[in-house]
Amino acid sequence: NLPRVVVNGEERLFINGVGYGIDGYCCEVGDKIVASGKEANYTSIAIKGLLFHYKTPDASVTVDGVTKKYKKVWLAPTMKGRYYGGGMMIAPKQNRDDPEGFVTSVVMFGSGKLKTLMVFPSIFKGEHVRHSEMVEIRKGKHVTVEFDRPTALQIDGETVLNVTRYEVFAG
């Protein structure tokens, strides 16, 4: 069974994940570059975004009824799969075939630009989770993420703009 996500009043199924934060920003910027007829370099977009353009919102994340509030959120994806964005192991312990059907909420938060830029490459090996002061992982069947201002997110790589809230129901 595939998980469902409700965004801007629309319900969709997804296979891998719902990404909010710098990844949604990268998809938004990448879409604009591709629409202009150029090739998007997502690594370059991410680095420039981390250093100069992406503005970290605050968010509240509720997993199975337990709400936590986060300041300066860099990432807040909810994953059915383990990887996204060209090989980033964002949810290292997530099992797509989990018999319980859980999804994983990952929040990278609270850090400054340079610390985030230093830790960000460790996502490719799933080692970012060692930075518990700025990365929190929670598993559940019902996840709601709310932001303090509209932002872009991606659902299996498809960009959705002006989102202030998304809700995931595990399959």
Language-model features: where?
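ATP/nucleoside-binding phosphotransfer catalytic cores, i.e., glycine-rich phosphate-binding loops
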Residues: 63-65, 95-100, 107-171
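Glycine-rich phosphate/pyrophosphate-binding beta-alpha loops
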Residues: 19, 23, 75-90
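Glycine-rich, charged/polar anion/phosphate-binding loops
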Residues: 45-48, 55-65, 84-91, 128-131, ...
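Short coil/turn connectors at secondary-structure junctions
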Residues: 9-11, 71-73, 98-103, 171
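A residue-level signal for conserved active-site and pocket-lining positions in enzyme catalytic cores
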Residues: 26, 76, 105, 157
